[in-house]
């Protein structure tokens, strides 16, 4: 006799499996950043304030004052006023998003965003493939005053030709002027660990967490560039993009970040065996370190000083900058001095790309550092791999 209860259960299971969202099996894929002119100029102190706020640290008074006093102004773009975004298809719409290894949300400008706030942006319109998650909301805010919030949908998201049909898409209903004025950036795609996704009441998985099982390896590699668009490789490493071998180190993801410890550091020819614990964050522009390291670095730069009116260390634009290196196992990752010359702040002065992490509690290895390296983010460890860019 056929067990009808068992048959019904098996049938229901088969239907559920068939209906579950899946990503096609692929070996790997790459997505290139696109260089776009910035629509606004923001003082570098605003970048520093944003990093403090991102990690829920109090923004130092002088940094906040410098960022607030300068604000944002429209500027004619120049070769030095570019930012780098990546094209992503969300539902039926193609948007330019920031890929951010320091957060775990995929949020976008949308048709729900007031028209005055989305002017100049490409935006997501939930269509027939979208399914709203009832009761789900999200909200982010940063120390520079930027913020966004809204509802959540499940929809098809395609990155580099690979799609996931039921990705959580955080649709912006409110967006602050800091995001609104950046008309080339239509949102963010987070690549940190899903445990820090901000959707309430139930956090959602990142795009990478959803597709990693379909890749030949559960990894992505980042090759950001100095004054040029970079590339993200998903599922594989590209030996043409780095020299030597890749050195790996363990990741502590207990706080949801790609956190690692460097065994020591060097400033020019001076070295220290003091370790540095920090996170690899493509969504933070600067390299933020302990005060003792920052002070030691600028002691080697003629004319450098902490300028409270600028909210950080500045130096004469003609100054020669030493390299900064960290030791990871047997590997030395070196940031050329020229990469640390971050932004002109007038009067022949330049804002440094190395600044204080005071109050954050750990260091931030942002783009100033990452642009010198080919970095592998390996979820199987988890671990990080480093090699010099080719």
From Swiss-Prot:
Q: Chief localization class?
A: secreted
What's the domain of life for this entry? Eukaryota
Domain (Peptidase A1) spans: 84-387
For this protein, the activity regulation entry reads:
Inhibited by the microbial peptide pepstatin A.
* Residues cleaved off as propeptide: 20-67
- Which EC class is this protein assigned? hydrolase
Q: What is this protein called?
A: Aspergillopepsin-1
């Amino acid at each position: 006799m056929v067990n009808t209860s068992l048959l019904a259960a098996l049938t229901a299971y088969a239907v559920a499996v068939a209906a579950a969202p899946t990503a096609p099996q692929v070996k790997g894929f790459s997505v290139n950043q696109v260089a776009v002119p910035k629509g606004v100029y923001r003082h570098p102190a605003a970048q520093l304030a944003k990093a403090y706020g991102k990690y829920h640290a109090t923004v130092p008074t002088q940094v906040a004052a410098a960022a607030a006093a300068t604000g944002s102004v429209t500027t004619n773009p120049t070769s030095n006023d570019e930012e780098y975004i990546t094209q992503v298809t969300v539902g039926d719409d193609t948007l330019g998003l920031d890929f951010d290894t320091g957060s775990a949300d995929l949020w976008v400008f949308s048709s729900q965003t007031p028209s005055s706030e989305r002017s100049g942006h490409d935006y997501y319109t939930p269509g027939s493939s979208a399914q709203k998650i009832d009761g789900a909301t999200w909200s982010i805010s940063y120390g520079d005053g930027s913020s966004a919030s809204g509802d959540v949908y499940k929809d098809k998201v395609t990155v580099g030709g690979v799609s996931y049909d039921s990705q959580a898409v955080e649709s912006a209903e409110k967006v602050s002027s800091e995001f609104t004025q950046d008309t080339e950036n239509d949102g963010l795609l987070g690549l940190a660990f899903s445990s820090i996704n901000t959707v309430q009441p139930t956090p959602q998985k990142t795009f990478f967490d959803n597709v990693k099982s379909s890749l030949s390896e559960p990894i992505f590699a980042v090759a950001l560039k100095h004054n040029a668009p970079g590339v993200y490789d998903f599922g594989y490493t590209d030996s043409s993009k780095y020299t030597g071998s890749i050195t790996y180190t363990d990741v502590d993801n207990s706080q949801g970040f790609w956190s690692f410890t460097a065994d020591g550091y060097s400033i020019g020819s001076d070295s220290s065996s003091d370790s540095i614990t920090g996170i690899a964050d493509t969504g933070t522009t600067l390299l933020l370190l302990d005060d003792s390291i920052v002070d030691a670095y600028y002691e080697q730069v003629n004319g450098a000083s902490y300028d409270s009116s600028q909210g950080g260390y500045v130096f004469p634009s003609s100054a020669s900058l030493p390299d900064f290196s960290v030791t990871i196992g047997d590997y030395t990752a070196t940031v050329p001095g020229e990469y640390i010359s971050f932004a002109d702040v007038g009067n022949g002065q330049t804002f440094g790309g190395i600044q204080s992490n005071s109050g954050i509690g750990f260091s931030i290895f942002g783009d100033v550092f990452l642009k010198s390296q080919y970095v592998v983010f390996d979820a199987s460890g988890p671990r990080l791999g480093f090699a010099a860019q080719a």
